[in-house]
């Protein structure tokens, strides 16, 4: 729960001086990106902005405290303040902030600005006490916020120092409105108004001016002088002389003498006790101070001018002026040291009664009360964990003695899940092993099953599927039906293990079961994970259309539950890119891969390896080797600067080997082949991919026999495990092996099998990347006119893609080629005496590439009748009567010029 007072603008009090000159300057705040109010404590920053904000509706107010250095807490309150200003306009961001479903503050802010694009009225967001922020991530995120905020939004920041928000840049671009301590200092006229409101007997203008000069217009000093004068301890001028030259850091002695020593003992204790509360209401005050009628007491303190301010319009919440509050807390530690733990305990109990466990934990920690802290965690820790209050939980668990954790194994489990969420896998197992060793009878307890479920998750994450399977099975055997979270975890792990083993049908069933349980209990990240796994399994089985539909369900879940910022979102858009690539929808595949990189923008660059490999695949399918080389340089740099799972390395190696094949770089392939991992098995699509990389490198090096052994074994495994997409890929590579080895009939046989299987998988680009060798074979099959209709259609589509992206259309028939051809000693006399025009050479190249008359007309952007004329002329000049004769003639010319066709 969010504390309401942190989102409430301070109430404009009676008897305050209206700062007309400063309000006039602030009236143009909507013309600036940032309004920055800076000064030391006590110059009236908050009072000024509360005056300016009075009557404005489109304004959100966020009062910071030290706890707001936690990124998740900062995000929750900031978005809540925007919601306050827009009357709930940014619902998606609100849900993302509440559920912590964002990758970083900057990505959350980016989503916020998308929603605010539809908000056209002026909008203001006030952040008070920004000097309390010390987290550099928040500073960087707020710089991003200011750079990208909508034009109709003005950020108003109040701080005791110059914040790290790119101020100089804003100042140069005239996008900064600044008010500093010199402007905030009271003028003579304002000081006179101030004393007239506060003192029963007015003082002369000259006297108030001298006082104002003595304290340099410092508002807090003026307030202290008025307080002293009312209490008749000193004359106003004497107080002013004493305060002259004093700043906020030297006020303690003065405040003791002039404030605390001049109130009765009951009020003194009330001030000291209540000061431990960062914000307070009637119930908190009554519990912490022991006084009845807490609200009445607060209002009385307010009337006495003891630096208490209202935090909301209802008058329910109060807080002390920061300067005075800090002073009181220091005095409380000195004067009430023995009582302080009990005071904090009372505060914790009251916050708990009002439903604010995070505030209660703050006071339980301050009280040093391990038992209270334990009880709060037992009741609320998992809720805080699910809301990503990880720093607070970690601090709390560290404060508990080990014996307390052992007595409450669920807290040990919580600590282990914290470690797991931070990828500290080794520490998880060490912690659980120590706990099991010391907790009596835990092996017969359900908690042991929960430990095993977590251990199973750690094992699969750490690349140990056998151990993960053993632990997941143990957990499922021992867990009661009602322990749904651990059952979801164990079921998911078991499904993933079976996926790794190639048992796809069983794995799919378990992942569907995981999805059902996760949806039932609102465990959305496991629901998303199970859908992603289902899609991968269906892709491996060759059911790409069903995989697509499963991905659509996952995208829908992301939208409904606002999971866009989870790293798993990158996984989903990446496998969508793989599917689009397979279907030769390259522009969409590239856009999806780039979206994945965007999702991971706030993570280490190494996390982008898989999406970068996907971008390279798109470049390779287009035949854009220059772009592929540029991207490969970055990929190889990432490979050399990170530790990756074997699946990631295999995917990265795939595009490297294909690039070497396309460029004929045998040296690079040979060097890689000497050092690359040779997996023991090939029983899943990850391992199949690595062995396919090895076979492709062997084919490039002319090592046909070992490559054939590899591919035949891969096919045997793929058929046995029904890895139909892998079988399709393997057949295409086997085709290239046979073709280059001169075994043309074998090459044609496996190509026909690959085309038939592609009716199921929909593969296009897997054929395209094999380039001209594939194009030649497809031309021959098309010319034979013996392919079934579906295969014929696919062959033509593949050929068009090859021609489009790899530029084989008429590359061999350009002007330079024709000139060399005509000067060749073996050129047919008919061509020498009746040379073709350049356009006719182009048409011959397109006929050779398998284009129909309509396609040639479209390619050359001329009428179909014109193409018929060109064809008739070139047939006559070549001395041929049919299209097949023209193709054979072109093939002979290419062979004569040294092209292997």
Curated annotation (Swiss-Prot):
Belongs to the MalT family. Keywords: Activator, ATP-binding, Carbohydrate metabolism, DNA-binding, Nucleotide-binding, Transcription, Transcription regulation. Residues 829-894 form the HTH luxR-type domain. InterPro entries: P-loop_NTPase, Sig_transdc_resp-reg_C-effctor, TPR-like_helical_dom_sf, TPR_MalT, Tscrpt_reg_HTH_MalT, Tscrpt_reg_LuxR_C, WH-like_DNA-bd_sf. ATP binds at residues 39-46. GO terms for biological process: positive regulation of carbohydrate metabolic process; positive regulation of DNA-templated transcription. This is HTH-type transcriptional regulator MalT. The gene is malT. Activated by ATP and maltotriose, which are both required for DNA binding. Monomer in solution. Oligomerizes to an active state in the presence of the positive effectors ATP and maltotriose. It comes from the Bacteria. Residues 853-872 bind DNA. NCBIfam families: PRK04841.1. One of its GO terms (molecular function) is ATP binding. Positively regulates the transcription of the maltose regulon whose gene products are responsible for uptake and catabolism of malto-oligosaccharides. Specifically binds to the promoter region of its target genes, recognizing a short DNA motif called the MalT box.
């Amino acid at each position: 729960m969010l504390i309401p007072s942190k989102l409430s603008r301070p109430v404009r009090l009676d008897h305050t001086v209206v700062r007309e000159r400063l309000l006039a300057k602030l009236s143009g705040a909507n013309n600036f990106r940032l309004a920055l109010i800076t000064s030391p404590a006590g110059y009236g920053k908050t009072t000024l902005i509360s005056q300016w904000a009075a009557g404005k509706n489109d304004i959100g107010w966020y009062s910071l405290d030290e706890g707001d250095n936690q990124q998740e807490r900062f995000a929750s309150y900031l978005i809540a303040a925007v919601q306050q200003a827009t009357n709930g306009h940014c619902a998606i961001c609100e849900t993302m902030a509440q559920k912590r479903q964002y990758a970083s503050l900057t990505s959350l802010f980016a989503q916020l600005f998308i929603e605010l694009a539809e908000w056209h009225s002026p909008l203001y967001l006030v952040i008070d006490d920004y000097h309390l922020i010390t987290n550099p991530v928040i500073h960087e995120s707020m710089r991003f916020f200011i750079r990208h905020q909508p034009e109709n939004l003005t950020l108003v920041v109040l701080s005791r120092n110059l914040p790290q928000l790119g101020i100089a840049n804003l100042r140069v671009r005239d996008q900064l409105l600044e008010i500093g301590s010199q402007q905030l200092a009271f003028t003579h006229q304002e000081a006179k108004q101030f004393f007239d409101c506060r003192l029963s007997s007015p003082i002369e203008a000259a006297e108030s001016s001298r006082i104002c000069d003595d304290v340099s217009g410092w508002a807090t000093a003026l307030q202290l002088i008025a307080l002293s004068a009312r209490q008749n301890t000193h004359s106003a001028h004497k107080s002013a002389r004493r305060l002259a030259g004093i700043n906020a850091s030297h006020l303690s002695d003065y405040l003791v003498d002039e404030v605390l020593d001049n109130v009765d003992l009951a009020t003194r204790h009330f001030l000291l006790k209540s000061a431990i509360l960062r914000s307070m209401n009637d119930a908190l005050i009554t519990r912490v101070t022991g006084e009845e009628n807490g609200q009445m007491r607060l209002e009385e303190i307010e009337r006495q001018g003891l630096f208490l301010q209202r935090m909301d319009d209802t008058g329910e919440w109060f807080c002390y002026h920061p300067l005075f509050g800090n002073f009181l807390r220091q005095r409380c530690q000195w004067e009430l040291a023995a009582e302080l733990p009990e005071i904090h305990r009372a505060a914790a109990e009251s916050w708990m009664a009002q439903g604010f466990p995070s505030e209660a934990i703050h006071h339980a920690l301050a009280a040093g009360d391990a038992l209270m802290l334990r009880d709060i965690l037992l009741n609320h820790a998992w809720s805080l964990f699910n809301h990503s209050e990880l720093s607070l939980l970690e601090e709390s668990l560290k404060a508990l003695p080990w014996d307390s954790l052992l007595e409450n194994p669920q807290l040990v489990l919580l600590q282990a899940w914290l470690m797991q969420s931070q990828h500290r896998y080794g520490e998880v197992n060490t912690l659980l092993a120590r706990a099991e060793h010391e907790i009596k009878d835990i092996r017969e307890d359900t908690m042991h099953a929960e430990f095993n479920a977590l251990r199973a998750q750690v094992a699969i994450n750490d690349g140990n599927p056998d151990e993960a399977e053993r632990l997941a099975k143990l957990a499922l055997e021992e867990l009661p039906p009602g322990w749904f979270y651990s059952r979801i975890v164990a079921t998911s792990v078991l499904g993933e293990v079976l996926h790794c083993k190639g048992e796809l049908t069983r794995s799919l069933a378990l992942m569907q079961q995981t999805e059902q349980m996760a949806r039932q209990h609102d465990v959305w990240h496991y629901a998303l994970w199970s859908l992603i796994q289902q899609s991968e399994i269906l892709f491996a089985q060759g059911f790409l259309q069903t995989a697509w539909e499963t991905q659509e369900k996952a995208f829908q879940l992301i939208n409904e539950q606002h999971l866009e910022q989870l790293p798993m979102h990158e996984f989903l858009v990446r496998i969508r890119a793989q599917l689009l690539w397979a279907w030769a929808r390259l522009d969409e595949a590239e856009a999806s891969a780039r979206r994945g990189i965007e999702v991971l923008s706030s993570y280490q660059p190494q996390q982008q390896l898989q999406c970068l490999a996907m971008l390279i695949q798109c470049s390779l399918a287009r035949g854009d080797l220059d772009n592929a080389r540029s991207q490969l340089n970055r990929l190889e740099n990432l490979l050399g600067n990170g530790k990756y799972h074997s699946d990631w390395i295999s995917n990265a190696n795939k595009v490297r080997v294909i690039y070497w094949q396309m460029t004929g770089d045998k040296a690079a392939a040979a060097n890689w082949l000497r050092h690359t991992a040779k997996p023991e098995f090939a029983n899943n699509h990850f391992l199949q991919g690595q062995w396919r990389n090895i076979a492709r490198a062997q084919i490039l090096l002319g090592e046909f026999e070992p490559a054939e052994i590899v591919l035949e074994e891969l096919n045997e495994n793929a058929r046995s495990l029904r890895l139909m997409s892998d079988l399709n890929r393997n057949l295409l590579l086997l085709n290239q092996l046979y073709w280059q080895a001169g075994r043309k009939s074998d090459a044609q046989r496996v190509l026909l099998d690959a085309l038939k299987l592609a009716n199921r998988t929909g593969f296009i680009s897997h054929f395209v990347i094999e380039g001209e060798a594939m194009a030649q074979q497809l031309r021959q099959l098309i010319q034979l006119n013996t392919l079934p209709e579906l295969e014929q259609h696919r062959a033509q589509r593949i050929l068009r893609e090859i021609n489009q992206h790899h530029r084989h259309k008429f590359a061999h028939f350009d002007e330079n080629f024709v000139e060399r051809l005509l000067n060749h000693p073996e050129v047919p006399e008919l061509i020498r005496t009746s040379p073709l025009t350049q356009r006719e050479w182009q048409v011959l190249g397109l006929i050779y590439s398998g284009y129909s008359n309509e396609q040639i007309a479209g390619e050359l952007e001329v009428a179909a009748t014109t193409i018929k004329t060109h064809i008739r002329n070139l047939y006559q000049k070549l001395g041929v009567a049919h299209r097949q004769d023209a193709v054979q003639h072109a093939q002979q010319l290419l062979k004569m010029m040294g092209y292997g066709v």
